[in-house]
């Protein structure tokens, strides 16, 4: 399934992107997600998810950072928060995210996005068996 996936700079920017035909939005906090266009702290994230859902669109949260042991308590708290907010999908790269998400009663769907290149089906199959439902492939791949 192809969808127009965008990374907004702010809640106000989401409104413009909805008007332009965006299907899904990648948002999140800079300390948990990589390559985000804007910072969506918890209050802004709640507002953004509500706006996105009210327009029948999808809210994905980037939790694709690299997490060390000292990040794990904050990571768990953030994933619990994302579950409460009812985000549509988490974009991840670190196995700790999978473990915490799968502790939830109704796990949030996962989208594997390792910041390394995803170039073969072995990688996709491996993470699929671990709970990922989608993968973001390397830009270097052709559609063939």
Stretches found by the model and what they are:
Residues 24-45, 62-70:
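Glycine-rich, proline-tolerant flexible connector loops at the mouths of alpha/beta enzymes
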Residues 109-144:
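Catalytic alpha/beta core domains of metabolic enzymes, predominantly
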Residues 1-26:
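N-terminal basic/disordered segments at the start of proteins
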Residues 33-51, 92-106, 121, 139-144:
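Active-site-adjacent beta->alpha loops and helix N-cap segments on the catalytic face
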Residues 1-4, 55-64, 103-115:
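Short beta-strand/loop segments at the ligand-binding rim of alpha/beta enzyme cores
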Residues 17, 94, 127:
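Conserved, mostly hydrophobic/aromatic
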């Amino acid at each position: 399934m192809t969808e127009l996936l965008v990374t907004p700079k702010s809640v106000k920017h989401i409104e413009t992107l909805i008007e332009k035909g965006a299907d899904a939005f990648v948002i999140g906090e800079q300390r948990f997600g990589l390559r985000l266009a804007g910072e969506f702290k918890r209050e802004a994230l709640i507002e953004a998810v509500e706006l996105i859902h009210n327009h029948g669109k999808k809210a994905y949260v980037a939790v694709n950072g690299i997490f060390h042991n000292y990040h794990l308590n904050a990571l768990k708290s953030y994933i619990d928060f994302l579950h409460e907010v009812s985000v549509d999908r988490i974009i991840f790269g670190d196995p700790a995210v999978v473990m915490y998400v799968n502790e939830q009663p109704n796990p949030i769907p996962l989208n594997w996005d390792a910041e390394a290149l995803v170039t073969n089906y072995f990688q996709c199959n491996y993470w699929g068996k671990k709970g990922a439902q989608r993968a973001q492939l390397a830009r270097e791949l052709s559609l063939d």
